[in-house]
């Protein structure tokens, strides 16, 4: 802890050396010394002026102040300050720090982060004809609020984690109590607690560190930008990983059949959605096995084809310098 105001200011100044956006404002109070610390553009200047600085200047006598910031400041998000590292982390997160010196030094952390991101808009990757036109944004608080607006139950829970020793990115694990599979939930908690990455900038970074098989060809987590799709997966018993700063939400566990599903399926009738998914799966099997079937019939079992059909194929391939296998391989690689 800090002995006096000078040691506090010097300690914070040394941490934020060569940081021109670090602001330390000293206030002239009756009976006390006070400072307000912020990081420019991270904290809301109007909120700090109205809810922090103005009430402090309006108080006539500070000599009897003993740390009751809630009775002075007009803010509902006030926490007690800790050591220098905790205060520095709070400042970087957009909070304001108030220090008042009377009989001893009292420190408070006020949540005053300023949001500078885009508003809710249409998704850019998963465009649908029917259904909601809103998508997730880069603000984790807005994303959680939008999910709560759809899944209106107190059983919707989430656990916050801080990942990245340098970035300290907030990641939330969301699930519905009673619906989510407990083994999946415990496995996700264990993965998030066991990893110690240096930098987390996007949900793609979270996907990499939570991948069970590092060299596996199939993904272990899904990704969606659509709010109603994420809500439907929550109700179906899935878990969500929401990363602050990313408009894409990770879903787990991810099964192979989800690759043939669309966000629009969740707003269609069950019969129609099942039929369309069956068509997608059939088209996948057709694209997978049709080249092999063509190679087998033409190269190894020409007697299974009608003679006139095989004659046409043979004449068309007479001037091609590569084999049918090489031709099909090139076609599959290119398309």
PLM regions and their residue ranges:
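Core alpha-helical transmembrane segments of integral membrane proteins
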Residues: 264, 270-335
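Membrane-embedded alpha-helical signal segments
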Residues: 1-289, 307
């Amino acid at each position: 802890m800090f002995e006096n105001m000078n040691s506090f200011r010097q300690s914070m100044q040394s941490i934020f050396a060569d940081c021109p956006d670090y602001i330390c404002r000293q206030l002239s109070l009756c009976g006390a010394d006070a400072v307000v610390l912020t990081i420019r553009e991270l904290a809301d200047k109007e909120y700090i002026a109205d809810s922090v600085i103005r009430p402090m200047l309006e108080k006539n006598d500070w000599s009897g102040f003993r740390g009751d910031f809630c009775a002075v400041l007009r803010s509902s998000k006030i926490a007690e300050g800790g050591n220098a590292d905790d205060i520095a982390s709070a400042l970087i997160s957009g909070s304001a720090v108030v220090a008042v010196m009377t009989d001893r030094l009292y420190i408070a952390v006020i949540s005053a982060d300023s949001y500078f991101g885009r508003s809710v808009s249409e998704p850019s990757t998963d465009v649908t004809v029917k259904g909601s036109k809103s998508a997730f944004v880069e603000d984790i608080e807005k994303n959680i609020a939008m999910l709560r607006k759809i899944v209106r139950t107190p059983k919707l829970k989430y656990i916050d984690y801080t990942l990245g020793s340098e970035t300290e990115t907030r990641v939330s694990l969301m699930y519905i109590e009673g619906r989510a599979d407990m083994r999946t939930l415990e496995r996700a908690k264990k993965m998030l607690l066991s990893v110690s990455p240096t930098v987390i900038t996007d949900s793609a970074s979270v996907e990499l560190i939570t991948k069970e098989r590092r060299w596996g060809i199939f993904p272990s987590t899904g990704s969606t930008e659509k709010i109603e799709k994420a809500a439907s997966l929550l109700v179906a018993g899935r878990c969500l990983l929401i990363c602050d700063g990313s408009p894409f939400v990770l879903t787990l566990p991810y099964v192979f059949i989800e690759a043939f599903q669309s966000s629009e399926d969740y707003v269609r009738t069950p019969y129609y959605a099942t039929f369309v998914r069956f068509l997608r799966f059939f088209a996948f099997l057709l694209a997978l096995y049709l080249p092999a079937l063509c190679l087998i019939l033409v190269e190894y079992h020409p007697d299974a084809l009608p003679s006139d059909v095989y004659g046409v194929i043979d004449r068309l391939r007479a001037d091609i310098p590569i084999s049918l296998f090489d031709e099909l391989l090139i076609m599959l690689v290119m398309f």
